[in-house]
C-alpha cells in the first residue's frame, strides 16, 4: 500500500476524498436539515441534460452540466418560493426534463461519447491537479461563506419562517446555498458518479444525527465518516483490484 502512494494519480485521489468529505459534510447537513434531499437527485439528473448538450455541441461537458445544474436548482427554488408550485413537484419536473434532454442529445451526438461512463459511475482516479485546484477553491469559498453566515444558515435550514421574522433574508440564503449545492453536485459527479452521489450527501448525515444534534457537530462527524469511508474504499479497491 505504501508503494501506491508514490503515484500521482493516487495522491490526487486522496486529495479529492478530503475535499469531497469537506464539501459534502456542509452541503449534506444543510439539505438534510432542510429536508430537501430530493433536490440532490433532481440536480444530479438535470445535470445529465447539460452533459448531453455539451457532448452534442462539442464543448466541455462539465461546464455545460454546471450551467444546467445551477439554472435547474435556482429554478426549483424560484418556482417553489415565488409561485404556487410544491417543491417536490418542481424537482420532479427538473429531474425528468434533464434526463430527457440528456438522452436525446447523447443519442444525436455522432460517434462515441468518451467519458460518459465516468459521469454515470464515477472514477476518482481520473482527477487531475487542475480539478483539485478548482475543487479546493470551491471548498474554500463554501467554508468562508459558512463560517461568515453560520447562524443565518442554521436558522434558515431548521426554521425559515422563524428566521424570516428575525429579519434574516431567507430567500437570499436559500439561493446562495442552492448555488453551492448545484456546484458541489457537478464537481463531485465525475468522481463518484450519479449513483453514489446522493448517498454521500445523505447517509453520513443520517448516521451523525444518531449521535449529534447540533448542526456544527453533525458537519464534523459526517465529514469524518465520509473521509474514513472514502480512504477505506480506495484502499480496498487497491487490495482487491476492483474499480475505485
Cite the ranges covered by each PLM segment.
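Hydrophobic alpha-helical transmembrane segments in multi-pass integral membrane proteins
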Residues: 106-113, 182-188, 231-242
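Transmembrane alpha-helical segments in multi-pass inner-membrane proteins
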Residues: 191, 195-242
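Short loop segments and helix-boundary regions at transmembrane helix junctions
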Residues: 29-112, 208-220, 237-240
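Hydrophobic alpha-helical transmembrane segments
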Residues: 14-19, 62-67, 92-93, 132-137, ...
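Membrane-interfacial amphipathic/re-entrant helices at transmembrane-helix boundaries
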Residues: 1-22
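Transmembrane helix-bundle core of multi-pass membrane transporters
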Residues: 7-12, 83, 91-151
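Generic alpha-helical transmembrane segments of integral inner-membrane proteins
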Residues: 18, 22-26, 67-75, 101, ...
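Helix-loop-helix "hairpin" substructures at the membrane interface of multi-pass membrane proteins
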Residues: 128-203
Amino acid at each position: 500500500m505504501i508503494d501506491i502512494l508514490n503515484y500521482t494519480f493516487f495522491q490526487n485521489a486522496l486529495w479529492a476524498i478530503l475535499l469531497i468529505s469537506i464539501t459534502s459534510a456542509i452541503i449534506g447537513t444543510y439539505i438534510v436539515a432542510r429536508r430537501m434531499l430530493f433536490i440532490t437527485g433532481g440536480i444530479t439528473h438535470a445535470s445529465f441534460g447539460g452533459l448531453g448538450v455539451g457532448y452534442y455541441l462539442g464543448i466541455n461537458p462539465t461546464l455545460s452540466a454546471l450551467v444546467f445544474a445551477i439554472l435547474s436548482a435556482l429554478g426549483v427554488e424560484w418556482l417553489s418560493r415565488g409561485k404556487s408550485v410544491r417543491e417536490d413537484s418542481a424537482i420532479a419536473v427538473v429531474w425528468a426534463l434533464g434526463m430527457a434532454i440528456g438522452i436525446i442529445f447523447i443519442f444525436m451526438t455522432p460517434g462515441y461519447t468518451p467519458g460518459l461512463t465516468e459521469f454515470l459511475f464515477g472514477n476518482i482516479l481520473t482527477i487531475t491537479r487542475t480539478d483539485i485546484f478548482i475543487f479546493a477553491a470551491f471548498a474554500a469559498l463554501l467554508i468562508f461563506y459558512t463560517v461568515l453566515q453560520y447562524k443565518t444558515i442554521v436558522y434558515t435550514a431548521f426554521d425559515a419562517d422563524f428566521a424570516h421574522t428575525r429579519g434574516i433574508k431567507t430567500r437570499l440564503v436559500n439561493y446562495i446555498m442552492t448555488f453551492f449545492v448545484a456546484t458541489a453536485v457537478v464537481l463531485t459527479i465525475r468522481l463518484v458518479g450519479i449513483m453514489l452521489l446522493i448517498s454521500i450527501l445523505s447517509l453520513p448525515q443520517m448516521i451523525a444525527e444518531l449521535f449529534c444534534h447540533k448542526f456544527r457537530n453533525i458537519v464534523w462527524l459526517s465529514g469524518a465518516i465520509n473521509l474514513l469511508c472514502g480512504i477505506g474504499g480506495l484502499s480496498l479497491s487497491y487490495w482487491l483490484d476492483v474499480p475505485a
